[in-house]
Amino acid sequence: MADIIHVMAREILDSRGNPTVEAEVFLDDGARGVAGVPSGASTGVHEAHELRDGGDRYLGKGVLKAVENVNEEIADELAGFEADDQRLIDQALIKLDGTENKSRLGANAILGVSIAAAKAAAESAGLPLYRYVGGPNAHVLPVPMMNIVNGGAHADSGVDVQEFMIAPIGAESFSEALRIGAEVYHALKSVIKSKGLSTGLGDEGGFAPEAESTKAALDLIIEAIKKAGFEPGKDVALALDVASSEFFKDGKYHFEGGEHTAEEMAKVYEELVAKYPIVSIEDPLQEDDWEGYTKLTETLGDKVQIVGDDFFVTNPARLQEGIDKKAANALLVKVNQIGTLTETFDAVELAHRNGYRTMMSHRSGETEDTTIADLAVALNCGQIKTGAPARSERVAKYNQLLRIEQELGDAAVYAGRSAFPRFQG
């Protein structure tokens, strides 16, 4: 296998106009891998550390320190490594950093190199990334969980829930799912417009109307699904990312004008699941409320997937604690929360081994990098969350999945409704 001869990085812009790291890894056979690192708006306190410069430049959000760490320390460390030994490369990066949360070199520096190394190795092997990572059995196309209404930290609307998603579960293929999602998205625009609400967009391409409540936003989406000619619950299901840590203050959930306990929030979710065809609720409770998650999973876990994002931060140790406590039943997979590919692989493997579902995810600050599309197929996630079917940094991932589906041909299988507990048994 080819050896790494050069590693470098540069500062580029993400989809929110903030700097991020782009890393490149070069091999001695001419192969090269490039990776752009995403960045989140609502970040969990347990995430790996994103290194920013501070000061006035880019309002303190520059990443020149992280870039310098790649160009100097990391480049020196990885010279001569065999590119196909991903675990050894990632272990070397973790050891070089020397901190628990990758705060010395920066998770944004480490992740960029980790992904770029895998891409270079895939090119050297003459394989697409999904096949290089996932092997010959990588063939399941994920259900696109399309965020078509943005609230919370992703928008300037009054809606507290951060993401309202549609899941085209009734499609026969990924390409059909994408078409259904796009048609509902366009129908939603006309529904919102007809009610005199704003059709402005949030960070992830979804609309950000001033809906009165969570139910009002869900009603808009149900109307759009019907207007597009589809049946809610049969063709298209709904999903929520509550991101509840964002409105948890002083021991209470400040939700829709009131102050609520975890028990009261659980009642809210039970009502929503009873009224709407919801298949997934992400981060329904504050990120350290283990007891609350266990109770909620016991109550609702057989009906919907309870997804840990800020709760698990793609961290195998936190996920293991969740498994032990029967807290949540699905893992949101964000490579930049943990900071290397192999740690991400370990988290997904642990989830699958214990019957937890997995959803590959973008961040609200994205680049045109399509790695997560390949990883969703490679790791058999069955679900991917990468925004609305609009804005090129979101669509880039969907388009990559179209290419993968076409390349797989008859071997391709679309996960569809089988991906969700509401349709099991």
From Swiss-Prot:
Residues annotated for Mg(2+) binding in this entry: 241, 282, 309
EC code(s) of this entry: 4.2.1.11
EC main group: lyase
GO CC, any one term: cell surface
Active-site annotation: 204 (proton donor), 334 (proton acceptor)
Cofactor binding note from Swiss-Prot or TrEMBL: Binds a second Mg(2+) ion via substrate during catalysis.
Sequence positions that bind (2R)-2-phosphoglycerate: 162, 334, 363-364, 385
SMART domains membership: Enolase_C (SM01192), Enolase_N (SM01193)
Identification of the protein by name: Enolase
Species, as recorded: Corynebacterium aurimucosum (strain ATCC 700975 / DSM 44827 / CIP 107346 / CN-1) (Corynebacterium nigricans)
Gene (UniProt): eno
